[in-house]
């Protein structure tokens, strides 16, 4: 998965702040950009707080404004991690990762308000699957897709 601003020591080329300018340049013109990153920033080896992840999101918002100044921005906070994501599912996460992931919606909401962005909390519509405690199941994807469609219709 991708991160906001962190280099993944196990998977090179995953830092959003490195990839985003290229994506913006190759996808012009942009009417609406949906930004939803942060789950992978919760991995234990980054030691990130929700606030520091928020700083990464702010950097990405600045990059979007620089690369696509006329685009509207929908900031989405990701779903929270499951309570036992580290226990037999994904050892890159720990107990603190779950707590940090639960703090992201409020941080992202504040950023959206301060930056004049549209906002949607994925955790209002979906939860992590029992299968891996990290990703949505089919019902979660469907519920979130319907919410995103409604939000896009409202924005555009």
PLM region spans:
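Histidine-centered active-site loop/cap adjacent to the catalytic His
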Residues: 132-156
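Conserved SGNH/GDSL esterase-like catalytic core that processes O-acyl groups on lipids
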Residues: 1-63, 69, 84, 99-103, ...
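Structural beta-sheet core signal
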Residues: 35, 74-76
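Substrate-gating cap/lid alpha-helix
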Residues: 81-121
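Short helix/strand-capping connector loops at secondary-structure junctions
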Residues: 122-132
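Alpha-helical structural signal in soluble globular domains
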Residues: 59, 63, 67, 103, ...
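Short, internal active-site loops enriched in acidic
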Residues: 40, 79-82, 126-127
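Surface-exposed helix-capping loop/turn segments at secondary-structure junctions
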Residues: 66-71, 119, 154-156
């Amino acid at each position: 998965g991708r991160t906001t601003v962190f280099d993944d020591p196990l998977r090179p080329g995953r830092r959003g702040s490195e990839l985003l300018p290229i994506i913006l340049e190759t996808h012009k013109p942009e009417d609406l950009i949906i930004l939803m990153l942060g789950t992978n920033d919760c991995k234990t080896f980054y030691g990130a707080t929700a606030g520091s992840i928020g700083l990464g999101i702010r950097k990405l918002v600045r990059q979007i404004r620089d690369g696509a100044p006329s685009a509207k921005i929908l900031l989405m906070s990701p779903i929270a991690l499951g309570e036992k994501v580290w226990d037999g599912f994904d050892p890159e996460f720990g107990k603190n990762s779950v707590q940090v992931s639960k703090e992201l919606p409020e941080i992202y909401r504040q950023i959206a308000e301060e930056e004049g962005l549209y906002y949607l909390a994925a955790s209002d519509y979906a939860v992590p699957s029992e299968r891996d405690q990290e990703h949505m199941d089919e019902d979660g994807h469907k519920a979130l897709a319907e919410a995103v469609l409604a939000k896009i219709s409202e924005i555009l």
